[in-house]
Curated annotation (Swiss-Prot):
Record-annotated active site: 471, 501, 538
GO CC annotation terms, alphabetical: cytoplasm; extracellular region
Miscellaneous remark of the record: In Salmonella spp. the spv gene cluster is encoded on a highly transmissible plasmid.
Function: Mono-ADP-ribosylates eukaryotic muscle and non-muscle actin on 'Arg-177'. ADP-ribosylation prevents the polymerization of G-actin to F-actin, causing actin filament depolymerization, destruction of the cytoskeleton and cytotoxicity. Does not possess NAD(+)-glycohydrolase activity, unlike most mART enzymes.
The species this protein was found in: Salmonella enteritidis
UniProt subcellular location: Secreted
Family that this chain belongs to: Belongs to the SpvB family.
Name of the gene: spvB
Molecular function in Gene Ontology: NAD+-protein-arginine ADP-ribosyltransferase activity; nucleotide binding; nucleotidyltransferase activity; toxin activity
EC code(s) of this entry: 2.4.2.31
Keyword Nucleus applies: no
All residue ranges annotated as the TR mART core domain in the record: 373-576
Stated name of the protein: Mono(ADP-ribosyl)transferase SpvB
Gene3D superfamilies referenced in this protein's UniProt entry, alphabetically: Toxin ADP-ribosyltransferase, Chain A, domain 1
Catalysis: reaction(s): L-arginyl-[protein] + NAD(+) = N(omega)-(ADP-D-ribosyl)-L-arginyl-[protein] + nicotinamide + H(+)
Upper taxonomic lineage: Bacteria, Pseudomonadati, Pseudomonadota, Gammaproteobacteria, Enterobacterales
Amino acid sequence: MLILNGFSSATLALITPPFLPKGGKALSQSGPDGLASITLPLPISAERGFAPALALHYSSGGGNGPFGVGWSCATMSIARSTSHGVPQYNDSDEFLGPDGEVLVQTLSTGDAPNPVTCFAYGDVSFPQSYTVTRYQPRTESSFYRLEYWVGNSNGDDFWLLHDSNGILHLLGKTAAARLSDPQAASHTAQWLVEESVTPAGEHIYYSYLAENGDNVDLNGNEAGRDRSAMRYLSKVQYGNATPAADLYLWTSATPAVQWLFTLVFDYGERGVDPQVPPAFTAQNSWLARQDPFSLYNYGFEIRLHRLCRQVLMFHHFPDELGEADTLVSRLLLEYDENPILTQLCAARTLAYEGDGYRRAPVNNMMPPPPPPPMMGGNSSRPKSKWAIVEESKQIQALRYYSAQGYSVINKYLRGDDYPETQAKETLLSRDYLSTNEPSDEEFKNAMSVYINDIAEGLSSLPETDHRVVYRGLKLDKPALSDVLKEYTTIGNIIIDKAFMSTSPDKAWINDTILNIYLEKGHKGRILGDVAHFKGEAEMLFPPNTKLKIESIVNCGSQDFASQLSKLRLSDDATADTNRIKRIINMRVLNS
């Protein structure tokens, strides 16, 4: 929790502390495109509800950029399509909307001609006329109104997006928010969002920096390049103290507004020492990256020399905080830099008190993501320096058991027939065997070590305070008559030789439902993130768990309907509750 001394109660009512990234995140499972992904939130104060929706996104199919390979922080933009080659920068080009969908010109009618000529927007008059052409996505899903404005005097062009929720977005109004050919300013490839305003007069203003030659060795292959095309997100200002219905950029290129919040993207201008709080105003020129690269897909060079080193959240409440610019949160980004390819390897969140005191950091050290495919087979890319959060061998064994090893292991423990070849392959792949043709003693020892690792991984998980769990069994088979008798004798103590799977949330339908009551100190553990089937909320017990039969309620008895109604049945319960023949109440014995 962020604590800022000196806030007035009125100010506190307006501010929500920044949402800090959580540690221990993992790459998501690959979707239908086979790509892994992860999202890292930025330290953005929520204001009164209208704040920038920005985050760092990783995709294993992503290219290089200001956050290293695979990472991006995309703002709303409209771009010329390059799917059919280099744009011609005329009416033959296709435009891509903010969602990546191809835009088509809206049909012109007598009541709604398209295009039209405009001299004003609302009460704001312009010094020149604009030709305004309406566009819409080829496949409609967002239901926004999109207008392309082209100046009839100076040729400046920008986009205006009317969102379905009433918010107005202005993209590329000034040259600072347009990615254009330095040798032909009218050849604009991308228009970046520059300002947004809600119907209530709340604004967000985006500032960008153009690439230059600061701290770049301009000799060798860097000589003679025009590197001014690239735009880097620099600041996002929001929380205007005085509401305003109209866009500020209609009348001014740099709005002189009292902003309460500023999100700063720093490229090394303010220093990256975690012990020194950065200043709001840049102190130095930005740093140059070791692996500069260029893009040419728009027909001109877009050269990138920068890495975003940190993201800073500032509050501007001079009366309450005693200073004009107060740093409250900081996302410090660390890279594995080298001349071949730079990777983001760690992210640390630091929060600050009102007096500049730095609170304990929140570290996000993540395993290395799968790198994008490299052309030409093997790469000379140096070994990654990602700060890897190692999983113990015991947790790895437990995770594999949950995913696919449970069947073989439990059959082996119960003395049932099991696929021996599959068991050997599992032990070999998990490095418990060194050969696929072990002796009987080698196989037995390897299985013993593997099972012990699973049990140790289980015991390392946190204890829980659950008092009842459920389990479904299928006992109404002639071959299981002895087992059924064992389970239906009150006072019997059952010893399950295998790992026993239960759930505190649901009882899965079978002919026998076990209500298993727990005492403090039991050895069952919720698998949580280790579980493969997370929807089951599985609680697993180690082998040789003892269960004492306390009571049995058979179908048709007076108490059966009452007990059945109290069960937390699984989703398929409504379809086939009459499969349940008995409910057995039992208790786990800890000794």
